[in-house]
Amino acid sequence: MIDLGVSKIALIGAVALIVIGPEKLPRVARTVGTLLGKAQRYVADVKQEVNRSMELDELKKMKDTVEGAARDVETSIQTSASDFEKSWSDATGSDASTATDELPGMVVFPEYKHPKKNWRLKTGATPQWYKARSGVRTKAQSGAARVARFRPQSGRSSSF
């Protein structure tokens, strides 16, 4: 930046005192200070933006290289899998799709479907012994019905 020493700053202050005058000098100094602060913040923001764009460019290049490597790995896996399938079909002497159909031990199991947010599936999957042990109500009953059920019977005498 500009090389300002103590002597140059003193010279600038003396000239400003003579030109502007002692009454307006504090107001002008405040204005100059705020403008310099805004300029410094603007320069810092520009630096941050340039650094951010450089980092984004570097990240994009890294992303491209990683994607290229992933594509290479995928193609190599596909070629090796196709070579294996070809050698397997040559060794067994039949097509791979018919070989799986002919095997008697191959049983197709149903696919598990997670209940996600379905409350009925979640509660239905809980065992009854766990519900009984943890005190889960299995039969809904209104408050009035519950009071009537557990109210002591008046008028009936119990025989001992």
Curated annotation (Swiss-Prot):
Keyword Cell inner membrane annotated: yes
Primary localisation category: membrane
Intrachain S-S bonds: none
Alphabetized Gene3D superfamilies for the sequence: 1.20.5.3310
Membrane-spanning parts: 1-21
One cellular component term from this protein's GO annotations in UniProt: TAT protein transport complex
GO molecular function: protein transmembrane transporter activity
Alphabetical UniProt keywords: Cell inner membrane, Cell membrane, Membrane, Protein transport, Translocation, Transmembrane, Transmembrane helix, Transport
Stretch list, region Disordered: 70-100, 133-160
Membrane topology: Single-pass membrane protein
Polar residues biased stretches: 89-100
Location relative to the cell: Cell inner membrane
UniProt record, GO biological process: protein transport by the Tat complex
Classification via InterPro entries: TatA/B/E, TatB
Subunit-structure text: The Tat system comprises two distinct complexes: a TatABC complex, containing multiple copies of TatA, TatB and TatC subunits, and a separate TatA complex, containing only TatA subunits. Substrates initially bind to the TatABC complex, which probably triggers association of the separate TatA complex to form the active translocon.
Stated role: Part of the twin-arginine translocation (Tat) system that transports large folded proteins containing a characteristic twin-arginine motif in their signal peptide across membranes. Together with TatC, TatB is part of a receptor directly interacting with Tat signal peptides. TatB may form an oligomeric binding site that transiently accommodates folded Tat precursor proteins before their translocation.
Family: Belongs to the TatB family.
NCBIfam families per the UniProt record, alphabetical: tatB
The name this protein goes by in its record: Sec-independent protein translocase protein TatB
Species the sequence originates in: Polaromonas sp. (strain JS666 / ATCC BAA-500)
